Amino acid sequence: MPKERRSRRRPEPIIRWVSLTLTLLALCQPIQTWRCSLSLGNQQWMTAYNQEAKFSISIDQILEAHNQSPFCAKSPRYTLDSVNGYPKIYWPPPQGRRRFGARAMVTYDCEPRCPYVGADRFDCPHWDNASQADQGSFYVNHQILFLHLKQCHGIFTLTWEIWGYDPLITFSLHKIPDPPQPDFPQLNSDWVPSVRSWALLLNQTARAFPDCAICWEPSPPWAPEILVYNKTISSSGPGLALPDAQIFWVNTSSFNTTQGWHHPSQRLLFNVSQGNALLLPPISLVNLSTASSAPPTRVRRSPVAALTLGLALSVGLTGIKVAVSALSHQRLTSLIHVLEQDQQRLITAINQTHYNLLNVASVVAQNRRGLDWLYIRLGFQSLCPTINEPCCFLRIQNDSIIRLGDLQPLSQRVSTDWQWPWNWDLGLTAWVRETIHSVLSLFLLALLLLFLAPCLIKCLTSRLSKLLRQAPHFPEISFPPKPDSDYQALLPSAPEIYSHLSPTKPDYINLRPCP
């Protein structure tokens, strides 16, 4: 019977990215093996659409041997080929795939052993897109990885990236061969956003490591760019070791930056030659048993040092106050000078206006006289009786302008009274006069403090000595052995204590609060 051919017509899928990221701290052990298992469960999604999944490890390596930069001590080289004297970055190739047929389940051992300084990327393994010509192929839906860490001291990140139509995922991480070690529960969900799944795995990490504190750096997700073969440039920077190390970053057109750092987009995804990657804020685990703080220490200070500090602070505050006062005085003086200039301009304008008004009044009076002469020449009376005006005058009033003469002496007297006792100038400019005033004020204040400082120091030291002498004194109590007794009491009774007290002292001790 011929095999039924599946229809290649696809509905519009909802493509969603699912990324599981877990950040752990690689301990300084000879070897640690972790078993990572990832399962994909949506059969309809697996059979009807292309499936792509990728696993990667990023190691932020901290070198222990400074003189071995940029390699760890006795680190293996993954290939004999080299670029500029350095070996190529290790990219595990795709495993167990056929171009037009079924794929077998792949198990690959990844073994990072202190590679380059900086952030490196390992894909173990990597699936390419399935061929569009064969829609009946069996796609890998279960991946098991064994991670062997050898003398790697730093932070590494495990990342799975899956795309498709609502995939069902199951994730588990176990340490081998010690079962009691951290065992992360499985994560089952229809679709988990990347940020939420990362937070869930972070909580599982906290439960798995009860003796460690989780440090989450809440900075923006800036991440070092990935090192790619034949696309590296050398740049000098702080590095991860002392002294400064050479760090190699990617320089590709996709990143379009020369600073060596990549700011991801809003979805925290960026493209590389091997596929997409997800950037998340880094976390680290800190052992609480080794984290200890030094005990606080108390150091007694001498009274002289405290007194000197107090005097210095008082002198500084007084100097600041004098400087502020001098600055305020200078500002007020400048304001008065500006007001005087405005006053002079106003007086000049009023005088000019008064002169113009006098000219107009003279013209009007001249016209009046001409009209009166004309009316009388024609046989009429003067202008006012002819037009029935009750009041006719030819005198120009000039009494109001006399008040302006009193304004200038008054302003000069107010300015002189305000500047007392600094109303001397010796022919100097304003800023020189203010500088001399400020220097003299500070000099007089320093002389006053020099005269009063010995008295203040003597008073304070005598007061402290008096307080120390008034401290309560307790008499010394001694108990001679009794020759007629084989038993010596460890704690004497109350009558024995009072019998050995000094007769000049009362039989009680007055307890009072400290002064």
From Swiss-Prot:
Entry-linked InterPro entries: TLV/ENV_coat_polyprotein (IPR018154)
Signal peptide range: 1-33
Residue ranges of the region described as Immunosuppression: 365-381
Disulphide bond pairs: 212-215, 212-392, 384-391
Motif interval(s): CX6CC: 384-392
Residue ranges, Extracellular side: 34-435
Coiled coil: 330-376, 388-420
Sugar attachment sites: 129, 203, 230, 251, 256, 271, 287, 351, 398
Regions that span the bilayer: 436-456
Motif (CXXC): 212-215
Feature type site, description Cleavage: 301-302
UniProt keyword terms in alphabetical order: Cleavage on pair of basic residues, Coiled coil, Disulfide bond, Fusion of virus membrane with host cell membrane, Fusion of virus membrane with host membrane, Glycoprotein, Host cell membrane, Host membrane, Host-virus interaction, Lipoprotein, Membrane, Palmitate, Signal, Transmembrane, Transmembrane helix, Viral attachment to host cell, Viral envelope protein, Viral penetration into host cytoplasm, Virion, Virus entry into host cell
Record topological domains on the Cytoplasmic side: 457-515
GO biological process: fusion of virus membrane with host plasma membrane; symbiont entry into host cell; virion attachment to host cell
Claim: Disulfide bond is one of the keywords in the record: yes
Function summary: The surface protein (SU) attaches the virus to the host cell by binding to its receptor. This interaction triggers the refolding of the transmembrane protein (TM) and is thought to activate its fusogenic potential by unmasking its fusion peptide. Fusion occurs at the host cell plasma membrane. The transmembrane protein (TM) acts as a class I viral fusion protein. Under the current model, the protein has at least 3 conformational states: pre-fusion native state, pre-hairpin intermediate state, and post-fusion hairpin state. During viral and target cell membrane fusion, the coiled coil regions (heptad repeats) assume a trimer-of-hairpins structure, positioning the fusion peptide in close proximity to the C-terminal region of the ectodomain. The formation of this structure appears to drive apposition and subsequent fusion of viral and target cell membranes.
Protein name: Envelope glycoprotein
